[in-house]
Amino acid sequence: MSNPRLRVFAGPNGSGKSTLFDAFSKKYNTGIFLNADLIENELRINGFIDLSEFGLNLKQSDFDEFITTERAESLINKAVDENHKINISLKENILVDEGIGTHSYEGALISLFLRHHLQEKNIDFCFETVMSHPSKIDEIKEAKLKGYKTYLYFICTDDPEVNISRVENRVEKGGHNVAQDKISTRYYNTLKNLFNMVEVVDKCYFFDNSGEEIKLIAKLSENKLSLEVEPSELPNWFVENVLKYYI
């Protein structure tokens, strides 16, 4: 029996993670896909999330146990610090938002809950993350201990101002907003975490989206880095946060 697969589509806000995933999913079987923003949007529109859509069958006790975990408590505390309440219940395998008004922390918490239980059942899945917090690295380490083959698809631009502009364009088209200061702060935090994540996963694919189109610039497998473009074409973010460790 082959190992379950976990694919992580990571990069700063506005880098093009969703666009990259959409292109990838047209060519490959990605398993179950988790995107906290899409979960938040579905919760806002419908008021609930049907867990059967993710191949899960869970009870309220499963959710109660989950929210006592360190990562869940940390997320809930962040929500409280920003004056957001999380009031979610699990009834007949459906997560119901019992609160007034949906916010991003609910989408993030539910995504974390789903990842937790998909791992427990060794189900193939992939998820999007900004990867601005080192907890994501620990999460991948745990998946590997459970036998998962892990893949990182990392996409970035060479300037957070590009990301800010693209998020603004996304909002104009009806997409979700992220505060400019958060985009900038997360951009640098994400890059700080990049090499630590690279050391954990089995394979990495690096994409640059600084220009008009997404470009695959490098691959990493078995600690061997192979460039897909000329060295002179490599963006600064890759040179400073990945390449320098392999030359």
Predicted regions mapped to residue ranges:
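Conserved glycine(s) of the Walker
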Residues: G16
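Phosphate-binding P-loop
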Residues: M1-P4, H117-Q119
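Short hydrophobic/aromatic beta-strand immediately N-terminal to the Walker A/P-loop
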Residues: L6-V8
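Conserved substrate/cofactor phosphate-moiety recognition/catalytic segment
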Residues: S25-E120
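Post-Walker A alpha-helix
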Residues: L20-F21
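The conserved Walker
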Residues: P12-N13
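NTP-dependent small-molecule kinase module
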Residues: N196-I247
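A glycine- and Lys/Arg-enriched "phosphate-lid" helix/loop adjacent to the NTP-binding pocket
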Residues: L145-N193
